[in-house]
Amino acid sequence: MIQSASTSALRAEYLRRLADKPYFAANLGTHLNLFGQHPASGWAFYLLPGSAVLELRGGSAVLCGELPGGDVGGDAREELRGFLQFLHADTLRSEHPLALDGWRPAAPLALWELPRGRTLPLPPAPPAELMLDKVPSMLPISRLVFPDSDAEADEFYSTACTALAHGVGNCRALLHGRKPVCTVGCYEASPAECYMAAGVTDPAWRGRGLARWLIVSLANELAADRTVRFACFPELCDFYAQLGFLQIGKIQHYSTDWNTQ
C-alpha cells in the first residue's frame, strides 16, 4: 500500500530508507526536510511496499529503494503505475531498473563524484571582465537556468531560495556587468554529500571554459567537507571525465505518454 509520509514517524522511516544512498539521500532527503510538512508546496512524499520511497512534484517522480519480489511485487508495481497515472506523472527516475507497463526506458543518467578531501586541477581562469559572485541574486539565475520556461524558472527559484534560506548549499555565478553568464550551485545536501546541479552557461559565452572553471572551483570548495556528486545526461560524460570527476553509477530514467494509453 502506498502511504503518504505525513507524520513524523513516517517521515523518519522515509529518511531511514534513503540512508546514505548517493544522489537520493541528498536530493529526496533535502526536499522532505524542506517541504514535507507543507502540502501546498507542490511536493509529495510516499512510502511504498518493500524498501521503496517515492517523491512527486508536478509531472516528475523519483523512486528510491526496491519493491517486493514475486506476486506481491507485481501488485505493488501495478499500484504504482496506477498511482502515477492518476497524478499525471510522466517522467520517472529510479535507483534500480523498473518494469512498468507503458513506461519506456530512456538513456540512464550518469552519476559522478569528487570524494571528500580530494581536489581537481583548476582549469584556466575566466576572462578578467567577468566577476565571481558567491551570493548572486537568484531571480536572474533562475532565468539563465530556464530561459524558455517561466514555470520551470519559477519552480527552480522557489526551491533554490528555500534551500539557501535554510543553510543548504551554495550558488556561484560569473557576472558580466550585473548579468550572470555562467552558474552552478548546490541546493541539496545530506550529512555525507553535496549535490551539484544547474550548471549553465549563456549561449553567447559558451566555448570559453567558463563552466569548467566554475564547476571545478565549487566542487573543490565543497569537497573539503563532503563528497560532491551530480548527475548528467550521457552526452556530457566526456566533459566531466576530462575534468577528472569519477563516474560511480547510473540513475534509471523512464517516461510515458498517458494520452496514448
What is each of the regions a protein language model found here?
Residues M1-A99, P147-A151:
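N-terminal charged segments
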Residues G58-C64, E188-A197, R206:
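A conserved beta-turn-beta hairpin within the catalytic core of GNAT-like acetyltransferases
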Residues D71-F83, A197, T201-P203, G207-E221, ...:
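Conserved acetyl-CoA-binding loop-helix of GNAT-fold acetyltransferases
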